[in-house]
Design a protein with these regions (language model features):
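Aromatic-anchored segments of alpha-helical transmembrane domains
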Residues: 47-56, 104-116, 177-189
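Membrane-embedded alpha-helical segments of multi-pass membrane proteins
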Residues: 11-20, 71-82, 97-100, 113, ...
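Membrane-interfacial loop-to-transmembrane alpha-helix junctions, especially the N-terminal start
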Residues: 32-46, 95-101, 173
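Membrane-interface transmembrane-helix boundary segments in multi-pass integral membrane proteins
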Residues: 3-14, 171-179, 191-264, 288-291
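Short, highly charged, low-complexity non-transmembrane loops/tails of multi-pass membrane proteins
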Residues: 274-298
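Membrane-proximal helix-loop-helix units in multi-pass membrane proteins
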Residues: 88-153, 158
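Alpha-helical transmembrane segments in multipass membrane proteins, preferentially the mid-helix core
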Residues: 20-26, 82-88, 149-169, 182
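Short juxtamembrane and helix-loop transition motifs at transmembrane-helix boundaries
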Residues: 1-8, 29-39, 54-68
Length: 298
């Protein structure tokens, strides 16, 4: 059975499809007006919102999730994006729009490079014991499509000059990410309070564990080791849970600041290169032109 595994043919097929679709969309929008592009992107966000909500009708959810409402809540970072991006798209708040752009592009790219859900036998905190068919399992297609749109819209916003990133605001992005993790934690508490998630599973990293807010699955290896470098020992215990687990959300604060900061810096070097080099006093050393627009003070 064809399944998606890291580095195999089907893994690269999905990446190729994503790149091809991006080129086709760019070609389609090339001679369209800016107004058309603006509403076209909003239409994509609305479509993705429907894709996110509509997943409760997919057999994998119908057969393995007792309370389907838990799967259309703020259960992870990308779910928050799918739900909130149609609203953030219209915001005048530059910090919120920065978050939308940076997290959208980054999470979309990371998902295609490391499609954990598509490669795993786990679903909703359960090990189903079988891998998903690369193309016949509709959840796989939905997974890739939704994350692709989460990437595509912010990418096109930047490509067509609908938003501008600024190195002066870059420091805010990791803290916005931490705020979203807190929202996910509150969402999980509410799901438990309403009886939609068993209390015994609330803090268990081997169950739902949305966006790893309760720790990593298994030992500190792989992803756990990458995140765990910046986690002090006192945050590697959870006083509210008897089993092995990390302190909810707080254990992710330093990793979010470090890795989120690096991603934000990379975005600035791509989209606000001149101002970023000036900010770090590198422009003269790299012998780049000095003619740049003034850095906005926000």
């Amino acid at each position: 059975m064809p399944i998606v595994q890291f580095g195999n043919l089907y893994y690269f097929i999905y990446i190729f499809i994503g790149i091809l679709l991006t080129l086709l969309v760019l070609r389609f929008l090339k001679h369209k007006s800016q107004k058309y592009r603006y509403w076209f992107l909003f239409g994509l966000l609305v479509f993705n919102f429907i894709v996110h909500i509509g997943k409760i009708f997919i057999p994998m959810y119908q057969n393995n999730v007792e309370y389907l409402i838990t799967k259309v809540s703020f259960e992870n970072i990308c779910a928050v994006s799918a739900i909130l991006f149609p609203f953030l798209y219209f915001t005048k708040n530059k910090t919120l729009k920065d978050y939308m752009v940076m997290v959208g592009i980054a999470s979309g790219v990371i998902t295609f490079l490391f499609p954990v859900d598509a490669m795993s036998t786990r679903f909703n905190g359960l090990d189903l014991g079988v891998y998903r068919h690369a193309f016949r399992e509709i959840e796989n297609i939905r997974f890739y499509l939704s994350h692709y749109i989460i990437f595509l819209v912010p990418f096109l916003m930047m490509h067509y000059g609908m938003h501008e990133l600024s190195i002066k605001r870059a420091w805010r992005a990791p803290f916005m990410l931490i705020l979203v993790l807190v929202i996910i934690f509150i969402n999980e508490l509410l799901m438990t309070l309403f009886g939609w998630v068993p209390k015994s599973e609330l803090f268990d990293p081997n169950k739902r564990n949305p966006s790893f807010i309760f720790g990593v699955v298994g030992s500190l290896g792989g992803l756990g080791m990458i995140l765990g470098i910046f986690v002090p020992s006192f945050l590697r215990v959870n006083p509210f849970y008897s089993g092995p687990a990390f302190f909810p959300v707080l254990w992710l604060v330093l990793p979010a600041i470090v890795y989120g900061g690096l991603i934000a810096l990379l975005m600035m070097l791509i989209y606000d290169r001149d101002h970023t080099l000036r900010f770090f006093h590198l422009k003269h050393k790299l012998k780049l032109p000095e003619e740049v627009e003034p850095i906005e003070h926000e």
